[in-house]
């Protein structure tokens, strides 16, 4: 069983709860992070959480994860999903299995959201399940 998981949230996810609630709901990022920590703890695992709006800081945190012995990464890269070769390369460099998460169904949204730079290297992609996608990703990772 996986003992160390890192949950990364990218740009604008710090605004969950107030940002376009018709798309993203009213659950805050703090609520998601607290639930994630509790879910992992209930299974005897450790959950670290991180959010940043800046691409380079996200890349740095992914590199740190390797040094810290993180065994699984869960990432909602937000808009960087569709633009960031740097985040893709960082995930490939550390070779930590990861799950890509999106609250909305990105395939039913604007065309530019249909391309992910992460999906083809992810263990799984979860989208369109609302914030439950985080719960599902954690459950999957904990049972690896």
UniProtKB/Swiss-Prot annotation:
Site label Transition state stabilizer, positions: 19
**What gene makes this protein?**
DQD1
Where does the chain bind substrate?
A: 76, 82, 89, 103-104, 113
- The identity of this protein, by name, is Catabolic 3-dehydroquinase
Report any Pfam family annotated for this entry: DHquinase_II
What reaction does this catalyse? Answer: 3-dehydroquinate = 3-dehydroshikimate + H2O
GO term, biological process aspect, one:
3,4-dihydroxybenzoate biosynthetic process
User: Which catalytic residues are annotated?
Assistant: 24 (proton acceptor), 102 (proton donor)
Read off the SUPFAM superfamilies from this record: Type II 3-dehydroquinate dehydratase
Principal EC category: lyase
Listed EC numbers: 4.2.1.10
Provide the alphabetized UniProt keywords: Lyase, Quinate metabolism
What phylogenetic lineage does the species belong to? Eukaryota, Fungi, Dikarya, Ascomycota, Saccharomycotina
